[in-house]
Amino acid sequence: MTAFAPLTRRRVGTLALACAAVAAAAAGPALAQEVVKIGYSGPLSGGAAQYGKNVLDGMQMAVSEINAAAPEIGGKKVKIEIVPLDDKYNPSETAINAQRLVQQHKTAAILVPHSGGIFALQTTNERSNFIVLAYSSVPQITNRGNKLTLRIPPEFTSYIDPFSKYVMGRFGKKVALVGADHDYAKAWVAAFKPGWEKLGGTVVAENAMSYNRATDFYSGVSKALAEKPDVLFVGGASEPTALVVKQARELGFKGGFVVMDQAKLDEMARVVGGYAPLEGAIGVMPVSEDTKPENKAFVERFGKVYPGRIPGSEAQWNYTAVHATVKAMQLAGSASDTKAIHAKLDEAYKSLRPDVNPGGVKGVDERGGTLTTERGAAVRDGKIEAVMTVANK
């Protein structure tokens, strides 16, 4: 029978060190996996909470897919995480959140889905060394020359020429401007009016209305219709925009509509009882109506992740933006070198598989804005038809 040596304090210490070494070796692969964080600052409470959640859901869906593929950056295994912070749609809160995201979570990129917050971050992001992933179509976002900004959707100005030509061809060249009165709508009108006139059109009435505070638009619409327009320019959030269209039809208007990109045709159709009242309207392509195979597959996958829900533009654009951002990190070989990551965004978008780029982003221009095609949609004979936005190839 073999006798065991007594466990002296020295032998116990030696055994403990050996066990620790074995445990460390076993845990090595797990410890080697770095966590790469992407920030999000947007509305997650208040009236715009659902909008902010739609954006975040698209981002989180992308991260789940990326992590399932065991990603590597710079030869190291990584896990991607989104760090979401609520800014209540308040730019000052966005700025506070960004400071926290960069200092505490070391985020190299922060996605913000509203222009006020984007502009707030652009005052400091180059100095603080983080990329602004900007989900807004306001042209000034990339016109300012910020070297660390990605504008995720196309500029809304890319819609003006093709949308105008479409309704002019179907209905005529007289337009009445009855959009909303908030800053974003004012920016749209300021760009749309000269674009319409450049094509030989005439603006016969201008009557902005408070879409966010009213549901009765009969008075404002009646004033515009008194000038006998062929087309109405409308736009704000989807529900009030739909009510403007509905009330215009009830007042006898038979013409077309240019719908600014804040409103979505499929969401409007649910308010007015289908596409028939929207006949002749043109706006951005609803994700739910895009018939491209890769888009239909995206809608199906989204429905499995979020049962009973249909994705909109907010989910789709930002889903692809996260895929592109991580791909840019991989191409740059770094999750922290923001200049190198930003420089690889064009190549990253171009290298994405169609299934993770259902919106068909073609790349990124020298100012940091995405390049797209076929994002317009019009209602003809009660159905959606695609309209090429050739101004932004």
Predicted segments with their positions:
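Extracytosolic ligand-binding ectodomains
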Residues: 2-4, 15-18, 32-393
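Twin-arginine (Tat) signal peptide motif
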Residues: 4-19, 23-26
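Sec/Tat signal peptide C-region and signal peptidase I cleavage site
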Residues: 26-32
